[in-house]
Amino acid sequence: MNVLVVEPLKAPYEKEIDPGLESMQHEVGGWIEAMGLDEDACIICNEEGKLNGLELNRSIKDDRGRIADIIAGTFLVVGSGEENFDSLTPAQMEKYKKQFRYPETFMRFGGEIVAIPIKPHSRPAGEKHKTEPER
């Protein structure tokens, strides 16, 4: 089954896993919980991730862009068939890679929890990293 793996503080990546319960439990590190994402895809995460203090990973937002939940620990994005989980289609894979492309950190601001994307820094070509102040 071709799935998207989303680990805390890392970019998401494709992985081929066995379609059984044990392989999904192995990937998320414990008992699994399925959360609907769209009509044809869902998130498989560690059911006790928050209780066990796993690192906060990505936010799930409602249709107004507000945080509805925060997933703790590694999670999978899988296709959802009639009765079973399924591989993501290539279009779904690209959609969810884009949706979860940036790791997030979380903080309380103005009485609400906000998600802050962690985007990679880029330097112009040829610019070197400075280790000492210029003299």
Identify what each model region corresponds to.
Residues 123-135:
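Non-Sec secretion/translocation targeting segments of pathogen effectors
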Residues 1-11, 15, 19-122:
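N-terminal nucleophile
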